[in-house]
Amino acid sequence: GYHILISATDANESYLTLAKQRNLDGIIVIGMYPDEFYQQMKKTQIPIVLIDSYCNDHYYNNIRIDDAYGSYLAARYLLDCGHRDAAFFAGQLKENGVMKKRLAGYRQALEEFGVPYRESFVFEGQIDYKSGVAMAASLARSSLGATAVVAAADILAIGAVRGFYDAGLRVPEDMSIIGFDDLEISQYLAPGLTTIRQQISLKGQRAVELLLEHIADPSLSKQEEILPLKL
């Protein structure tokens, strides 16, 4: 069997010290961190698998999706439906982060349809329900004239439905929304939420499998797996 330690690291905590003190055989890291983090973690000399990271250091194994392509599919869906004024709701747009990649996909779709990119149509916040509500309220109060929203996460889309409802706008009659992630909770919305589906559980499964393979044989070459997604 295996012992699993789940830890949220403090901003001031030494990741290298943490790994050594706990005598870890391998590590799975979720999300993006500063470059210093990746340089520090290499010093552990133990197998590490990254999930949802765009770190280009070949020391690491990496499991992710093509976030830009997924967001491109979402934006293109709305454009194919005739929308030319689609806003973009996102979490923090960190350089080389997932949200930045999803913004790039949105921009690519606009460009292909000859629709100008407008920064005023991009709303940035946290990836949570309250941010979705707040973004929708802000868009509803604005004079932008948006008719649709590409939400870079389902939880933002779910919050947005509430925010638009509170502002007197109906979804999808007055405002169309498409999400990203295909969270189970999105199935319970009425009407249902159109979303980009990624297999989140498969990310975890493949990360563990890859980590165990490299613990058993550290000489294995590093791998990057880009998992499928679909509308």
Spans of model-derived segments:
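Periplasmic-binding protein-like
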Residues: 21-31, 87-90, 122, 141-153, ...
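Residue-level signal for nonpolar/aromatic packing positions in well-ordered secondary structure
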Residues: 26-27, 48, 78, 106, ...
